[in-house]
Amino acid sequence: MSDTPFYLIDEARLRENMRKIERLRERSGAKALLALKCFATWSAFDIMKPYMDGTTSSSLFELHLGREKFGKETHAYSVAWSDDEIDEAIGYADKIIFNSLSQLDRFGDKAAHIERGLRLNPRFSTSGFDLADPARPFSRLGEWDTERLEAAMGRISGVMIHYNCENSDFALFDHQLSRIEAEFGDILKRLNWVSLGGGIHFTGPDYPLDALADRLKKFSDDFGVQVYLEPGEASITQTASLEVTVLDILDNGKKIAIVDSSIEAHMLDLLIYRETAKLPQQGEHEYQIAGKTCLAGDIFGDAKFEKPLEIGDRISIADAAGYTMVKKNWFNGVAMPAIAIRREDGSIDRIREFTYEDYRASLS
């Protein structure tokens, strides 16, 4: 397979993450729901389903996809449900989580036959970037006033608390969970379930997985609740690459390799959060790897190679599964990467191609 660009999902690496999730579930008793906002490539769901309990969503379409393609337990969350969405959402969901007391007041009766929850905002997080900080000033994400939370009791069976972001520090997780226990314990002990959301980087290298499992079990036992986690990035970290080809090489005081992809169109989160792509760093031949759109800052980052690059060379951009395929777009009309899976036997299945007809159909 030579046609680039394409996202290449590695089945063996994905299973490694899944086995860590399975180990955490077994030791802690917690349930794990795939966060579709991060990764929703449903052709990989058959690999993941044996190791996870279901999906959680942030919109009606994600919810529908989770029910249709993943099955098992399906949680529905949205910052705001609309009148023309709520009946369909309730039809797909096992649990529906409202973002605010006003949404619970408005739609709670419609959802009385399924489990209802509310988003609890503890007013702190591990995010170091304001754009992704649910505890930022004037946050619209969840309720934190105990009087408003009390007003929901009797109508909800659980809460969702999403406050971690790429948190690989177990001690910090432990400390912040203790704060939640101290401040909201009187409410938690009257619930049946608590989702601690995603953002816990427990599949990363050297993470103390058993310590996390034991802490989750203690939380569950102390408050008598079923714990849920919503791993997105933790499910798919280091499981895919974006495969690109060098189209041109420039030297404008710095060697630049232009590839057949775009950070704006194909790895947008890196641009948003001012991060560089994970590029090769072996060798003494250094190049800036740049995309092919007209955006001046369409730059993946600097890479090093053991020998000079040539037009036609392939480059693998690592860790390209999370928040990539769900955010890819048609900026400049640049060809959208195909999606492929490298199977455990080494074979590669090219599972989705995108064509001009897809581009045209996305417009009007």
Where are these regions (language model features)?
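N-terminal capping/small domains of soluble enzymes
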Residues: 1-71, 77, 81, 262, ...
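Anionic group-transfer/hydrolysis microenvironments
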Residues: 12, 101, 121-123, 162, ...
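Active-site-proximal beta-alpha core segment in soluble small-molecule metabolic enzymes
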Residues: 30-193, 207, 215
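Glycine-rich beta-strand-to-loop/alpha-helix junction loops that act as flexible
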Residues: 35, 164, 194-203, 231-234
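Short glycine/threonine-rich loop-to-helix capping motif typified by GTGT followed
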Residues: 169-174, 203-212, 238-248, 304-305
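Acidic/histidine-enriched ion/cofactor-binding microenvironments in catalytic or ligand-binding pockets
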Residues: 182, 186-191, 211-222, 303-316
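Charged (often Lys/Glu-rich) extended helix/loop segments that serve as interaction or gating elements
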Residues: 226-364
